[in-house]
Amino acid sequence: MDKYDVVKDLGAGNFGVARLLRHKDTKELVAMKYIERGRKIDENVAREIINHRSLKHPNIIRFKEVILTPTHLAIVMEYASGGELFDRICTAGRFSEAEARYFFQQLICGVDYCHSLQICHRDLKLENTLLDGSPAPLLKICDFGYSKSSILHSRPKSTVGTPAYIAPEVLSRREYDGKHADVWSCGVTLYVMLVGAYPFEDPNDPKNFRKTIQRIMAVQYKIPDYVHISQECKHLLSRIFVTNSAKRITLKEIKNHPWYLKNLPKELLESAQAAYYKRDTSFSLQSVEDIMKIVGEARNPAPSTSAVKSSGSGADEEEEEDVEAEVEEEEDDEDEYEKHVKEAQSCQESDKA
């Protein structure tokens, strides 16, 4: 931590707190995310960090390094100054079809790259898509599941509190193909960009999880009359929102769909992507062995308060305490969310009985 200065808090996600820091020597801004040491550091955390390290794509937040603090495992990654795509939609209300396509094309390219490496995201949503600060923003996928997999593999932030992005097969509690589920979530993201609302929520009763889940299972959605989109766009959505995941459109088919191909930026063409991989030689300086060693040490619970005091300044102690408090608050929100979804699933099962 000695080489970074804290700039500000960025918020909280599935796993804890994120902060903006500046490298003291290079002045580069980075995002740092904290996971509490001890029981939360399991094989899932190790696997996902290694997975993220291997991802080198312009539409994916770049992993930089992991650092062990007295109380947390800190993950350092690229900072996207444009904020969440979610916030951009909240400000705009909804996007034009052209703008929605622009971001959807980038999302699909990033997800397709992950899938080519046999990595599924399982938590794709607007809050997990960031933007850089350029005038024509570059979309960046983030949050590759740094916490234990939940029963649904998808936990919206408490500020959203909806299972709206979750595919039917995930709700069924049976084994499912994460790639198919990612495609469904991409479809929900596209719908929200176009409409400014979730496809399977009852607009008059948005917090009714039971009703939302029933609508997801029945693929019950519609495009409001006030939203004017092309037939090609409607067709693509209808091919994504298919209950039987085996019959759902694949990423390869999406990338050949007429609506997707319209005004496709040249940097998203297959040839341009291949050139990017050859040109981009930057990677994490930490070896897999170094990362695994740090993660292994992080499995040991945080030292006692006295040990923390002897290892750092008062400012560091305050920072660690703040992170811990925010993480605990977020955990409570997640537990409450999971409880509601379990209740909704039980209702769904009782309806079938």
Swiss-Prot record:
Instruction: State which Enzyme Commission number(s) the record gives.
Output: 2.7.11.1
| Chain intervals with Acidic residues compositional bias | 315-336
Signals that turn on the gene: By abscisic acid (ABA), salt, and osmotic stress.
Q: In which tissues is it expressed?
A: Expressed in seedlings.
- An example Gene Ontology molecular-function term: protein serine/threonine kinase activity
Positions bound to ATP? L10, G11, A12, G13, N14, F15, G16, V17, A18, K33
In which compartments does the protein localize? Answer: Nucleus
Write down the PROSITE patterns for this protein, in alphabetical order. Answer: PROTEIN_KINASE_ATP, PROTEIN_KINASE_DOM, PROTEIN_KINASE_ST
Q: Which reaction does it catalyse?
A: L-seryl-[protein] + ATP = O-phospho-L-seryl-[protein] + ADP + H(+); L-threonyl-[protein] + ATP = O-phospho-L-threonyl-[protein] + ADP + H(+)
Keyword Zinc-finger in the entry? The reply is no
Give the UniProt record's GO annotations in the biological process aspect. protein phosphorylation; response to osmotic stress; response to salt stress
Q: Which InterPro entries match?
A: Kinase-like_dom_sf, Prot_kinase_dom, Protein_kinase_ATP_BS, Ser/Thr_kinase_AS
CDD domains xref list: STKc_SnRK2 (cd14662)
Task: Work out whether the entry's keyword set contains Transferase.
Answer: yes
Compositional bias of kind Polar residues: 302-313
Provide the active-site residues from the annotation: D123
**Protein kinase domain: which residues?**
4-260
Pfam families linked: Pkinase
Keyword line: ATP-binding, Kinase, Nucleotide-binding, Nucleus, Serine/threonine-protein kinase, Transferase
Which GO CC terms are listed, alphabetically? nucleus; plasma membrane
Residue segments, region Disordered: 299-353
Q: Where is the composition biased (Basic and acidic residues)?
A: 337-353
Recorded family membership? Belongs to the protein kinase superfamily. Ser/Thr protein kinase family.
Protein name as annotated: Serine/threonine-protein kinase SRK2G
Q: Which organism is it from?
A: Arabidopsis thaliana
